[in-house]
């Protein structure tokens, strides 16, 4: 029994302190990476080829954290998708870099997450990873995110946050991670935390950011400004205004 317990914890031994803060009973929710052998590639309309994932399955997820208070305002359900090619030094969740890690993200899982949001004390959904904005993960997420937004429209009290290692400019038309579904995803988001984690800029005092280069973008305000000024989202960025009480938190 002790050996099995240690094996269950082994993936977390490679994570930072943030990952180790998860309750130990969740260690079993991580599944070892599986090979891509035998999986056929998918091609997007713009010609971009994704790694071999079966046609009926676009994405795996590494973990779901219910009642999460670390990844966005309030109490949230957080979905950690699998797959990231960025490889940031000292990433808090490097076990989710492998696209084959975890379990299939299917309709049953979607329904369970949406059901978890249907409580007055839950403030919304957070999507992180891994990298949600990897092209194949965008394809696996877009319909789900639109389902959540339809169930809980803007102003309903349920917000959708997304953490990405991309900067917003990379998600604009012509950017490295812009696909035919990117605009649909961005249209559903209330908050986008953008930018790669940079160890040299690490700052423990930041709320919902790991390093000072990252931004918490208020997407509703950004969309409104972009429309008002007739410019691209990346040229109309409005940063999230946190409660002033947190500005006094220093080390």
Per-region residue spans from a language model:
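N-terminal [4Fe-4S]-dependent radical SAM core
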Residues: 49-80, 89, 93-100, 228-230, ...
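P-loop/Walker A phosphate-binding loop and immediately adjacent motor/lid segment at beta-alpha junctions
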Residues: 146-149, 202-250
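Extreme N-terminal basic, low-complexity initiation segments
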Residues: 1-13
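Conserved Radical SAM active-site core
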Residues: 57-61, 75, 90-176, 180
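Basic polycationic patches enriched in arginine
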Residues: 14, 18, 31-34, 39-42
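Structural recognition of alpha->loop->beta junctions
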Residues: 175-201
């Amino acid at each position: 029994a002790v050996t099995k317990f240690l094996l269950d914890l082994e993936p977390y031994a490679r994570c930072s302190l943030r990952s180790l803060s998860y309750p130990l009973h969740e260690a079993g929710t991580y599944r070892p990476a599986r090979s891509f052998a035998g999986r056929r590639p998918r091609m997007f309309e713009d010609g971009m080829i994704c790694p071999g994932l079966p046609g009926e399955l676009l994405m795996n997820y590494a973990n779901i954290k219910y009642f999460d208070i670390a990844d966005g305002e309030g109490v949230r359900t957080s979905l950690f998708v699998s797959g990231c090619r960025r490889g940031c030094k000292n990433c808090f969740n490097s076990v989710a870099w492998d696209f084959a890690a975890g379990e299939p993200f299917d309709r049953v899982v979607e329904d369970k997450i949406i059901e978890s949001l249907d409580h007055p004390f839950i403030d919304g959904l957070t999507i992180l990873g891994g990298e949600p904005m990897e092209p194949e993960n965008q394809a696996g997420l877009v319909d789900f995110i639109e389902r959540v937004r339809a169930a809980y429209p803007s102003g309903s009290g349920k917000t959708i946050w997304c953490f990405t290692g991309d900067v917003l400019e990379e998600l604009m038309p012509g950017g490295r991670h812009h696909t035919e579904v990117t605009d649909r995803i961005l249209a559903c988001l209330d908050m986008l935390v953008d930018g790669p984690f940079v160890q040299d800029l690490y700052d423990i005092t930041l709320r919902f950011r790991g390093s000072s280069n990252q931004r918490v973008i208020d997407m509703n305000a950004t969309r409104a400004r972009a429309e008002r000024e007739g410019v691209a989202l990346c040229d109309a960025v409005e940063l999230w205004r946190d409660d002033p009480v947190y500005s006094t938190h220093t080390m």
